[in-house]
Amino acid sequence: MNTKTFTPKSTMKIYTCLCLLFLAGYLVAQNNTSALLPMPNQITSVKGKPFTVRSGKTAIYLSQPELQFTANTLQNILSDRMQVEIPLASESDRADIRLLIDPAMEGNEHYRIEITSKRITISGATVRAVYYGVMTMDQLLLGDVCATTQKKISPVYVDDAPRFSHRALMLDPARHFLPVNDVKFFIDKMAHYKYNILQLHLTDDQGWRVEIKKHPKLVGKDYYTQEQLAEIIQYAAQRN
């Protein structure tokens, strides 16, 4: 067996390389754009102090009742990433995080994010657009983990709309059956990356996965009931 002796000089080189690798990882962690996927059309760093999330003081305002699910999603994101519970506010001037529908914006998936030291505004042409803005907000928090752990969000301006209206992924439960909760998990990940169409391949030689009440012998052991498929459709619709 060959052996190699490490001299002080070679050991120092190894130590230096390890330090550089650690520093590179640290610098990436400091960049709040490092987790953005897909990359927004426009993202601009803004000079100034970060926005600080304050438990008991920070609140979320939604301009329309249709944004309720989106607001709840943002509440869950802030709870998961920062361990803070943020309430909803009934009036705009009492909230420093605002979710707004702006019909003047062109394109039904066009959204903007404006983060300053005093306020966060996520606006979009539609409910769907605002939801995608919240997904980008989550990625900003993931990309800037050092600030996120301190309940701070770096100031930034984002203006984004998708290049393609059809953004699809396929699941194949016909060949490899997936429980309902696994399908929902996949939908959550699709929403995070702004995919908007899920194709479920439900029938093939390996299995028929759709319940047909008039033909019960079509299905085997693993299949989706009509109620489960309706549940999946509703779950996906909420996440656009």
PLM region descriptions:
Residues 12, 20, 29-162:
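Acidic, contiguous N-terminal accessory segments
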Residues 19-21, 192:
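Alpha-helix capping and helix-coil boundary motifs
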